[in-house]
Amino acid sequence: MRRLRSVWAFAAAVLAVTTWGRVELRWTEAPALPGIGVLLPFAGVSNGRVLLAGGSNFPNRPPAEGGKRHLCDEIYALDPSAADPAWTLVGRLASPAGQGGSATVPAGVVCVGGLDAGGQPTGKSFLLSWQDGRTVIRPLPDLPAAAKEPAVAAHGSVAYVASGDRVWRLDTADGSSGWQELDRLPEAIAGAKAAVQNVPFQRTALFVFGDRVGYALTVAPVAERGWRRVELPLKVPAAAPLAVGDQHILFFGGFPFTNAVSCYHTVTDRMFDYATATGLPKLGQAVLRLPDGRILSATGEVAAGVRTPECFVGTFARTKSWHWVNYAIVVLYFAAMAFMGFWFMRRNRNADDYFKGGGRLPWWVVSLSIYATMFSSITFLSIPALTYVSDCRYFGICFGIIVLAPVVVKWYLPFFRRLNLTSAYEYLEVRFNLACRLFASAAFILFMIARTAIVTYLPAIALSAVIGIDVNVSIVVVTAITILYCTLGGVEAVIWSDFVQSVILILGTVAIYVFLVCGTDGGWSGFVSMGSAAGKFRVFDFALDWTKPVFWVTFVGGVVANLASYTSDQCVVQRYMTTPDEKGAAKSILFNGVLSFLNCIVFFTIGVAIWTFYRSNPQLLDVTMAKNDAVFPLFIGNDLPAGVSGVILAAVAAATMSTLSANLNAAASAFTTDFYKRLVLRNRTVEQSEQSEQSNNRLLRCGKICTVVTGLLGGGFALVLANMEVYSIYDQFQRFLGVLTGGLGCLFFMGIFLKRVNAVGATAGLVANYAVCFALDQTAFAGKPHLLLYGALGMTACLVVAPIASALTRRPDDGKPLEKQK
């Protein structure tokens, strides 16, 4: 125990001297608004133009000297991308108006409430937009009640307005709908401000802030009932809120005329002082995001009744660069992987060496290779990020491999080993027919190209966020190095490199865990108590609700997903052939199952540790973080000491390259064995048969060419993804991969366990599987099952249809023992 305490103390000391990375908001002067400035104008962005309209001021004398408030009707436009930007008077409102609220939607700027020309509160609303070089004003339905200084925010095309204790929503994309009233706030809030930002459990909420208190209401992906109270330890009365990044809300200025910038983090429910914005307007200013991501603070009030025309532009800038030691470690790692490819190239004398490593690899090396293959960079980044933003309920997926490992060893492994298969899909021809084999192999190769692209693209985003290199450069480097050592070294280089990468992954995760817990208030006890109080350790939720990730949903989904991976994925099945005997392969599967389960425990708790760390240190978070999946790599890059950060990033690269190398070699193996060898070499003469040296050379050459082509296609697709909107594409593509992979798992399951299913029945079952999965994926309806159940429901349909179709089309030889069907 004393030694353990010493380790914690040492880690805490190292952590204490670390220079933490920060993102600062740096301000520069922008063109001033003509005139003396206004308070609470309507402001937003439309088609690249900043539009600012209305507002109020005291043009003659300040209110303390008897001055009268003047409402404005001018509309100004600013092109922030121009070489010499300036505010231009581009139109006027139908009548003077001011002290209302506004928010930007895709169609323009929603302007709501305020004071009318007579100085009376109004419920009028309109849409202000910039079209064809001029302003366009389109009337919107009136609010059900007048609202002076309403709180306005937007999410997509939907605008939200809060006034007093009443809240409304309007979908500006639906011209036929009017304002719809939502649940009332628990209390009336005078001078409220609003913002929309992401919250835990992958939801989006509307926030309405008052003085020391705020309330949040979930509005997406599904609107929920009931407001949640948000405590604000820092006073922000009348401060202008602005949602930034994926999880932060900044508050600018406020009463009594402060120039402070505060920040609220929605996931950890923490608020802190972010910066001081000297010289900026302090109250009633227009604060908005420009098209290029910068922040504009325009006009407002600097003292009671004293307006200012001054405008400022804020730019986020990093204050810390990555240490050269980290770069050196990453470069050495990539160089070592390339050297490994050259080293094992000398051992490849034939196709059997290239694709199966000559069957001479130790079981413990193969086991860690399977672990590294299944534990991709997506897993490395997404599991901690998922737990950080929610809880541990998805842990039920991890029980799947524990349940399936003995099943694979007892029933699946003997088939693959005794048939001495290079490609997993050779079995499908023996069991069903050639068409099933070719279909499965072709589908698998397409899966590998797509998976290569996704697995390359996502870590490239992470590397770009950490060290600032261009995403495209990162994709090219990772793809090139992986193709090099995979092409030269074959599967033996892949497996030994996977072994090295597994060691890096395991040691790296231990280091991360130590630093996260040491950086949490209270250390280990603080980590446990803080996580428990927030429900972050919740695993077992036995609610009978198939629309949510309750335990039985995640467990069933995990079993089906692992069934497909460990029985029909060439990446994994190929490794069963690389040990000297079946006993060694069985050991590798069982050991990998235990290791993977323990690894899940570590990475799910790392997600909790990230949450407790940033709840203790919210000021260390990057407020510009664009997506939740970036939280882990940003911690690695910003909050770990030099050297340690480089080793961990090498672990991220290891996870990426493990999956990529497995994908490339498996795709080459499938194409060479199922297409080239089966369809081309089989028709050759005896002298050029597969036993000849010439035939082996051809297989080896074909495998290397296919490895390069698959890598180039995958890398090219990754470059396409990097230069377009990819979030929805990635989500949809993941579902697509899951549907088709589950179908292949069905084929192998029926082949081994359903002896009377013939080729016609198997095909009919696959059609039923795809029909169910695609229908679930592409349709929306009340009570729709959770995504994790799509594969299970598709497999159920397959297992029902296939036996029926086989019974209707049975031939005399159907159902005979496998060896008699050869």
PLM ranges: what are they?
Residues 2, 21, 820-822:
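Short, intrinsically disordered terminal tails adjacent to the first/last structured region
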Residues 2, 14-15, 427:
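Compositionally biased, low-complexity segments enriched in small residues
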Residues 5, 17, 24, 84, ...:
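Intrinsically disordered regions, especially transient/low-confidence alpha-helical propensity segments
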Residues 11-20:
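Hydrophobic h-region of N-terminal signal peptides that target proteins for export
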Residues 18, 158-162, 208-210, 251-253, ...:
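Short, intrinsically disordered, charge-balanced linker/junction segments flanking boundaries
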Residues 21-322:
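Kelch-like beta-propeller repeat domains
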Residues 317-822:
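Membrane-embedded helix-loop-helix hairpins and adjacent transmembrane boundary segments
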